[in-house]
Amino acid sequence: MRVMPRDKSIRSGWRCDSCGQLVPDLQAGWVEWLAAEDTRGKPKVSGLRLVHHRNTSARSPESYGCRYNPRDEFRKNRGIVEGLALDRFAGPDGLMLLLSMIAERELPLQEVIELAKRVQIPGYEAAYELVHDAVSQGVIAPCISSGFYLQCEIWDVLKWAKCRPSAKTSQVEHQNRCVVSH
């Protein structure tokens, strides 16, 4: 699996939940989920994820690309693939849509909350994979709780990520680079 360069992941966009590659802008993204019935015949919605809207990933040669294949999902458990363009979840109207989904419990609560953070909170997506290491190294101590970070904490993590040494960088090079970049 190709790893996204650190500077690219910090800049902007979202990581595709299917292929792991960059979804560079709102128009390139799609949010989808699966609707089916549970064993008692009650509606069950699951599998909320942010993926590439069109087949842009070399890892997914199928026509559906990173998106769920509706035929496969129906065969598995008579599931129906539902979704909306990523831009529907952005901005004030997108926040209202996400809040309505939370209020109506249309989708699993934790999945909707995580999507809201990814789309609505500046820097959250870029900092997400870095936060665990940043907390363990004392870069931040979350004021609210794990998974819920203030903007100052997110920006501290992103600044730290730009200056932290890689396995190939000596401590002296790291210190010099950080001094220059401030």
Residue locations for each model-derived region?
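N-terminal cysteine/histidine-rich coordination modules
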Residues: 1-70
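Alpha-helical structural elements
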Residues: 9, 25-28, 69, 84, ...
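Long, charge-rich boundary regions
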Residues: 43-118
